[in-house]
């Protein structure tokens, strides 16, 4: 009885065991299959990180078009406006002229003494320029839009027109056409600002009649009292857009600004040392038959800085000549100063940005030389690009993307800094604050030296100093103020190259004090002779008693 009943029991256990094994195998198969499918899908995502919903071309300026293909990057681009786009006069950043009143004396005679404010994100770059009092109280050049707008379609149109070639929308959309863009850039650089702005609003942007992602600025300023004749809408004009840095067909990073193309060709043709630019060194060792072209020769890592260097640079931007990057002698502050010193305008007059409103000195105005100062710093020497810090990589699913919310690295320390610096966030913040604090303190000392220099020059003029006597003093003033302005206008507060910033400010102080001393000598009466004053010979050992003459 027992033997007969145990046989079915063993058989049942075998069936259950077999079923369990089949179940485990099935589950394991499903898990492995799911993992393999997930890996395959992630690999496919990494190979094809976007789905092309709309076709783009060379007139697809409106970034909302690109956002349909790359929604993640577009959403981050919109974040450059902050949580909400703040327009209107009450929303403008605080005036630097109120923060640092001595700037009014630094810029006396120049439009920046009228209105000069803290910079905001890329979303505001066109808005804030259109409403600044600088463009309403003083006539500015169309060259300003080279960097404050997305102007390449306009440049191409003007170039094709000047070259006698078709310039309809089909021709504009077909090809970037750098020769036409360069020609249009030359044609429009010296034209009045509002004339070029109005032309920009008539260019196709891929979404005719539709408003852009950000509100349009009031073209006549906030009161509209100074609105130019034929007041126009701003719908088709955009701040920097996707098309300014990317090829719409391949998405490759590219250079679109004519000023940078010419500036890099001039830099490469010279012999000045450069950091983080291996393609320039390779070109210099070659046959040099064609000018250096970053779009053909630069590495991807170089391009991650070059696209920023299209605008975050020093340049001439006014009505006397075509916009120009002063890089023929190099990227150091004194290299650019030498370039401006040697330059003459087309009419033969020596180059200047403005003549100082108090002293009449011929001065150069620095713009925002972040690219040049960065090139002198340790990060550039280490091969760290602008985008590595300001647009750091991040993981989104299987994709590795650059963060398109372009901003200070201090707002994204984990991705921007701690991928290289294995220290705490608080320590990194303290390092930056220390560097910037020292630079600001030195800047204030340079500003104090500048104001005392200006006072001394004015007193010398009041005392009857001649033009011949003042000429070398005004040359020192120019050197002092160029150096101070260089660091004031650069937006990192010295962080991009701390030692270089300190050197430049130290030279500014030195030149200011030299000019002040010479001016005081012109103002003061002749100094009495010092030959009869008691004097103790220099000794190698400190004497134990006071000299007889000083008892």
How does the language model describe each region?
Residues 113-118, 131, 140, 150-152:
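Long, composition-driven intrinsically disordered regions
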Residues 527-540:
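Mature N-terminal, pre-catalytic/accessory segment of carbohydrate-active enzymes
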Residues 118-127:
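Intrinsically disordered, low-complexity acidic and serine/threonine/proline-rich regulatory regions
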Residues 1-15:
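N-terminal Lys/Arg-rich, disordered targeting/topogenic segments
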Residues 14-23, 32-119, 156-238, 248-388, ...:
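Primarily the internal scaffold of c-type cytochrome electron-transfer domains
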Residues 137-155, 159-161, 168-170:
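A cross-kingdom signal targeting lumenal/periplasmic-facing segments of multi-pass membrane
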Residues 148, 239, 243-248:
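Outer-membrane beta-barrel channel domains
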């Amino acid at each position: 009885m027992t033997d007969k009943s145990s046989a079915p029991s063993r058989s049942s256990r075998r069936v259950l065991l077999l079923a369990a094994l089949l179940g485990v195998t099935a589950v394991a198969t499903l898990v492995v299959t799911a993992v393999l499918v997930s890996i395959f899908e992630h690999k496919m995502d990494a190979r094809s990180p976007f789905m092309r919903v709309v076709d783009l071309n060379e007139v697809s300026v409106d970034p909302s078009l690109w956002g349909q293909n790359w929604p993640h990057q577009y959403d981050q681009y919109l974040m450059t406006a902050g949580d909400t786009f703040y327009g209107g006069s009450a929303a403008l950043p605080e005036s630097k002229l109120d923060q640092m009143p001595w700037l009014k004396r630094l810029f006396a005679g120049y439009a920046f003494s009228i209105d000069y404010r803290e910079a905001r994100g890329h979303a505001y770059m066109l808005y804030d320029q259109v409403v600044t009092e600088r463009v309403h109280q003083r006539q500015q050049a169309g060259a300003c839009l080279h960097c404050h707008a997305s102007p390449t379609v306009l440049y191409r149109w003007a170039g094709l027109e000047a070259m006698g070639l078709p310039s309809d929308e089909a021709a504009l959309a077909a090809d970037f056409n750098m020769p036409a863009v360069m020609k249009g850039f030359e044609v429009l650089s010296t034209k009045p600002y509002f004339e070029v702005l109005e032309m920009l609003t008539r260019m196709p942007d891929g979404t005719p009649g539709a408003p852009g992602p950000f509100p349009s600025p009031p073209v006549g300023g906030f009161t509209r009292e100074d609105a130019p004749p034929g007041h126009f809408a701003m719908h088709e004009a955009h701040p920097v857009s996707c098309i300014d840095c990317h090829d719409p067909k391949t998405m490759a990073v590219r250079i679109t600004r004519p000023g940078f193309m010419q500036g890099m060709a001039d830099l490469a043709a010279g012999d000045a040392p450069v950091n983080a630019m291996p393609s320039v060194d390779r070109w210099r060792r070659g046959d040099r038959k064609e000018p250096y072209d970053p779009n053909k020769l630069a590495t991807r890592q170089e391009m991650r800085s070059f696209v920023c260097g299209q605008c975050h640079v020093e340049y001439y931007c006014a009505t006397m000549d075509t916009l120009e990057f002063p890089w023929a002698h190099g990227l150091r502050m004194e290299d650019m100063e030498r370039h401006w010193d040697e330059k003459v305008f087309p009419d033969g007059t020596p180059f200047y940005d403005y003549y100082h409103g108090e002293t009449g000195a011929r001065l150069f105005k620095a713009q925002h030389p972040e690219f040049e100062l960065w090139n002198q710093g340790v990060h550039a020497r280490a091969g760290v690009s602008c985008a590595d810090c300001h647009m750091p990589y991040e993981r989104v699913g299987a994709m590795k993307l650059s963060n398109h919310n372009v901003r200070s690295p201090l707002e994204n320390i984990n991705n921007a800094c701690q991928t290289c610096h294995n220290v705490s966030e608080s320590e990194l913040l303290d390092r930056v604050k220390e560097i910037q604090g020292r630079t600001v303190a030195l800047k204030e000392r340079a500003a104090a030296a500048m104001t005392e220099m200006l006072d001394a020059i004015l007193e010398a003029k009041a005392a009857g100093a001649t033009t011949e006597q003042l000429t070398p003093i005004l040359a020192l003033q120019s050197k002092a103020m160029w150096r101070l302005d260089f660091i004031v206008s650069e937006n990192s507060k010295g962080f991009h190259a701390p030692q270089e910033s300190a050197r430049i400010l130290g030279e500014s102080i030195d030149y200011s004090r030299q000019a002040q001393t010479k001016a005081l000598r012109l103002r003061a009466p002749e100094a009495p002779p010092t030959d009869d004053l008691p004097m103790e010979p220099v000794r190698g050992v400190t004497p134990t008693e006071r000299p007889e003459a000083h008892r």
